[in-house]
């Protein structure tokens, strides 16, 4: 998709489609008023009759007989004074879905008719670009017949002259984020027989080859064993696919800047191991590597926009399968940190790979560490499919992540990490057990991880409820790439 900023009258531009916002009431934008005059009052009549709707996120088409615009695409914004950021995102998603399904090859967006209630032009442009890229995304890599590509290929965002530089910067930023989200979706949507730990390692090296600011390496099981990663290796013990610890370094800042580390859970298929999952819906366990996929996507976005920050991605990739060599309930393993874990449930495997990866992070002397994982079904029970679960040992870090989520609409909700929950992990035979029972499952999982993060500021993002969608629209969401990218851009010094 080709995007550009436009600071001239959008109505005077020849285009296949002009996007215009409509509010409830008689007072409309200057763009609407001019268009209505050109159409001899027809638009006003259609609005009054309800054929053009001002209801939030509804879209209406009109084909003018005169002028250089072939189509008008109106999007309802509701009551002008009530339009919020969330409402704008909803409207942006709706209008871009309509545009992507149309026959228009190019479009102009009349931004002034959309940015109400002091919504900034740059921010609004970001939402529009990401909404259109998401609407145009398809995954047909594994199909013999490919989907018909979206016809629209060029979009001009028309705004005030003084906003042109902000719009251009927003286009560059949002395009990078959208590209990162697409990579995250692609990796997540791949089946487990293709996307293996070794496949992820190869993708990391391919990404580093594409961007000079990235470098990648992957440790095999021999090196991991030498490092003492007994917990990590216990997960891959039953699989024919060897585990990989993948490290991708992005150096956009100077040598004085500390590293921010992202740790991604990369279980490429989770059968549950000996604690086997039910068969229904097990196909969706290919999405158990979406935390790792989001690390890939975030690093791509940062490299694409040449962000002046240093970030290390650590990906714990393994496949969890049952076999005669698989770890059994009751087995005790020694982690890289030296702490021992009694494994009561082999389906609580994400924390077993993450704990060793978190210990490995110490060598980077990080400013912050954020792990991203489809960790607990309990998070879906607590927060549904809208918010990422957030737990942290540092309030400032937690607040920065929450703010990034609010800004991008990729929101998170903080849960407590109190010492009182730690006792649920007590074991009679090891330093801890890997499950804490049904109560507060998301919290006790984070409590487990917290025992391996004593040497740095750390936050845990449980994306079990937001990483993918089930049903007829099944597919990876690309979250939380917007949140992570926004957070890391906020860490740029100076």
From Swiss-Prot:
Cofactor note: Binds 2 manganese ions per subunit.
Coiled coil feature spans: none
GO cellular component: cytoplasm
EC number: 3.4.11.1, 3.4.11.10
Catalytic site: 277, 351
Cofactor(s) for this UniProt protein: Mn(2+)
Pfam families linked: Peptidase_M17, Peptidase_M17_N
UniProt keyword Kinase, yes or no: no
UniProt xrefs under CDD domains: Peptidase_M17
GO function terms (MF aspect): manganese ion binding; metalloaminopeptidase activity
Residues where Mn(2+) 1 binds: 270, 347, 349
Keywords: Aminopeptidase, Cytoplasm, Hydrolase, Manganese, Metal-binding, Protease
Record localization: Cytoplasm
Source domain of life: Bacteria
GO BP annotations listed: proteolysis
Gene3D superfamilies tied to this protein: Leucine Aminopeptidase, subunit E, domain 1, Zn peptidases
Keyword Amino-acid biosynthesis recorded: no
Binding site for Mn(2+) 2: 265, 270, 288, 349
Cited function: Presumably involved in the processing and regular turnover of intracellular proteins. Catalyzes the removal of unsubstituted N-terminal amino acids from various peptides.
NCBIfam families to which the protein is assigned, alphabetical: PRK00913.1-2, PRK00913.1-4, PRK00913.2-4, PRK00913.3-5
HAMAP family: Cytosol_peptidase_M17
PANTHER family: CYTOSOL AMINOPEPTIDASE, LEUCINE AMINOPEPTIDASE-RELATED
Family: Belongs to the peptidase M17 family.
Name by which UniProt lists this protein: Probable cytosol aminopeptidase
Organism per entry: Hahella chejuensis (strain KCTC 2396)
């Amino acid at each position: 998709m080709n995007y550009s900023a436009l600071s001239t009258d959008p109505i005077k531009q020849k285009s296949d489609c002009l996007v215009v916002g409509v509010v409830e009431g008689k007072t409309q934008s200057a763009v609407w008023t001019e268009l209505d005059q050109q159409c001899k009052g027809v638009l006003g009549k259609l609005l009054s009759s309800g054929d053009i709707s001002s209801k939030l996120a509804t879209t209406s088409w009109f084909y003018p007989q005169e002028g250089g615009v072939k189509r008008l695409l109106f999007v309802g914004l509701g009551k002008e004074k009530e339009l919020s950021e969330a409402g704008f995102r909803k409207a942006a998603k709706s209008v871009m879905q309509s545009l992507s399904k149309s026959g228009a090859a190019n479009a102009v967006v009349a931004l002034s008719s959309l940015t109400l209630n002091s919504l900034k032009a740059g921010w609004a442009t970001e939402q529009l670009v990401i909404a259109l890229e998401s609407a145009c995304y398809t995954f047909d890599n594994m199909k013999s017949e490919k989907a018909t590509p979206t016809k629209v290929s060029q979009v001009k965002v028309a705004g005030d002259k003084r906003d042109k530089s902000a719009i251009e910067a927003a286009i560059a930023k949002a395009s990078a984020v959208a590209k990162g989200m697409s990579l995250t979706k692609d990796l997540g949507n791949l089946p487990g027989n293709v996307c293996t730990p070794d496949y992820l390692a190869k993708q990391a090296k391919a990404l580093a080859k594409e961007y000079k600011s990235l470098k990648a390496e992957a440790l095999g099981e021999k090196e991991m064993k030498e490092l003492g990663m007994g917990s990590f290796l216990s997960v891959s013990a039953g699989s024919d696919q060897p585990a990989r610890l993948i490290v991708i370094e992005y150096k956009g800042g100077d040598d004085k800047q500390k590293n921010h580390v992202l740790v991604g859970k990369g279980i490429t298929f989770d059968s549950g191991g000996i604690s086997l999952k039910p068969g229904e819906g097990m196909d969706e366990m290919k999405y158990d590597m979406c935390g790792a996929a989001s690390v890939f996507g975030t690093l791509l976005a940062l490299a694409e926009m040449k962000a002046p920050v240093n970030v290390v991605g650590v990906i714990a990739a393994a496949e969890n399968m049952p076999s005669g060599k698989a770890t059994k309930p009751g087995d005790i393993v020694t982690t890289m940190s030296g702490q021992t874990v009694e494994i009561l449930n082999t389906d609580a495997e994400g924390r077993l790979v993450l704990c060793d990866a978190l210990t490995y992070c110490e060598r980077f002397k990080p400013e912050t560490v954020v792990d991203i994982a489809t960790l607990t079904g309990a998070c879906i029970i607590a927060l549904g499919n809208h918010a990422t679960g957030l737990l942290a040992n540092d309030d400032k870090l937690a607040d920065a992540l929450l703010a990034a989520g609010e800004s991008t609409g990729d929101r998170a909700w903080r849960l407590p990490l109190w010492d009182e929950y730690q006792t649920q992990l007590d074991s009679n035979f090891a330093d801890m057990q890997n499950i804490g029972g049904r109560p507060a499952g998301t919290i006790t999982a984070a409590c487990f991880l917290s025992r391996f993060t004593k040497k740095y500021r750390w936050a845990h993002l449980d994306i079990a409820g937001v990483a993918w969608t089930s049903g007829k629209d099944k597919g990876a969401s690309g979250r939380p790439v917007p949140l992570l990218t926004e957070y890391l851009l906020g860490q740029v010094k100076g």
